[in-house]
Amino acid sequence: MKKVEDYVRSIPDFPEKGIIFRDITTVIQSPEGLKLAIDGINEKLKGVDYDVVVGPESRGFIFGVPVAYANGKGFVPVRKKGKLPCETISQDYKLEYGTATIEMHKDAIVPGQKVVIVDDLIATGGTTEAIIKLIEQLGGEVVKIIFLIELEGLKGREKLSGYDVDAVIKYAGK
């Protein structure tokens, strides 16, 4: 029986020498791979009390929406600056070279809501750290953070200490 990691395509030396790029397009192109990915995330949510799923553009949408749907929850998108039509709050975060900004609608999280963040991959943790700040600024409580893939060598989990973080697949390297 295949596991979800069997559907992840590993590309050596991309985008640079010494890096193994973990490509999830092969997971979502396969009905079996996609089902295993969503089922794996849902398995990590068993027993978690939450109200809403939050996911960042764009791959957080791919995994977050079906998880929200399967569990009878709503989904809140986090987008790049300037992509949401109503009043937003924003948070800057660091990239390898420079900064980026993400936004969420100001009315997306109700104070006291219990939130699960779902995304495809954690590397350095910077994007997720910014998402947490947005949620908490609106009065939400992050009760679980789930990734399909964790690149343990990049130590992103350390930025998220104090939160319940899990991953379906863990790779030791970068």
Which residues are covered by each model-predicted region?
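Active-site-facing substrate-recognition patch
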Residues: M1-V52, A100
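PRPP-dependent phosphoribosyltransferase catalytic core
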Residues: D6, E129-K174
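Charged, well-structured alpha/beta interaction segments
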Residues: Y50-P66
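Conserved acidic residues
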Residues: D51, Q113, V143
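Short Gly/Thr/Asp-enriched flexible loops that form oxyanion-binding sites at enzyme active sites
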Residues: I62-N71, I132
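Short, hinge-like loop/turn segments at secondary-structure boundaries
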Residues: N71-G72, D92-E96, S161-D164
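Short, glycine/charge-rich flexible loops or terminal/linker lids adjacent to PRPP-binding catalytic cores
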Residues: V76-V116
